[in-house]
Amino acid sequence: MVELESQEAVTVASTADIAVDVSLRLLAAATSLASAVVVAANHQQRWGVRVDFTLFQVWIGFVAVNLVCTVYAAATAAAARKAMGRWWLHHADAVVVNLEAAATAGAGAIGSIAMWGNEASGWYAVCRLYRRYCNAGAAALALSLAAVLLLGVACARSRYPKMPPTT
């Protein structure tokens, strides 16, 4: 068969391309799930006052978004061969990356106020009293940031997809 110059050559995804995509998505799912579990299991009691994630709406949203991100990343990893090259994949990736980034930024903002306080508004740094709780929150934020970066790379790779190999 003779190809004309005006015809575009179809690039086919190799097994390595699919493996990289699946690996990125599974790592994102694992880090996002770990972040949600760390926050949900995190609590500390001092002087009869128990602090856990249900006291702050931003942490409840953070856990919910991380669980949604986990399910999405695992589902797209499982269906990577079929989903690769679909027009909707990049858009769905972008939505999930932005949700994860927004949840991480919101929780990080509350975490920074808890860590350093805000004299102008009269908010005191509570991490001096609840150090273990704040350290676990910081670890969860780091894990969530890793999930954002991993999904961001997967999103960038889905922007110019190669077609899955035909079997």
UniProtKB/Swiss-Prot annotation:
GO cellular component term of the entry, any: plasma membrane
Top-level taxonomic group: Eukaryota
TM stretches of this protein: 18-38, 55-75, 95-115, 136-156
Cytoplasmic side: 1-17, 76-94, 157-167
Keyword Nucleotidyltransferase: no
InterPro entries (alphabetical): CASP/CASPL, CASP_dom, CASPL
Keywords: Cell membrane, Membrane, Transmembrane, Transmembrane helix
Main location: membrane
Extracellular side: 39-54, 116-135
Pfam families found in the cross-reference section: CASP_dom
Record's bilayer topology term: Multi-pass membrane protein
Cellular localisation: Cell membrane
Subunit composition and interactions: Homodimer and heterodimers.
Family of the protein in this entry: Belongs to the Casparian strip membrane proteins (CASP) family.
Name under which the protein is recorded: CASP-like protein UU1
Organism field: Oryza sativa subsp. indica
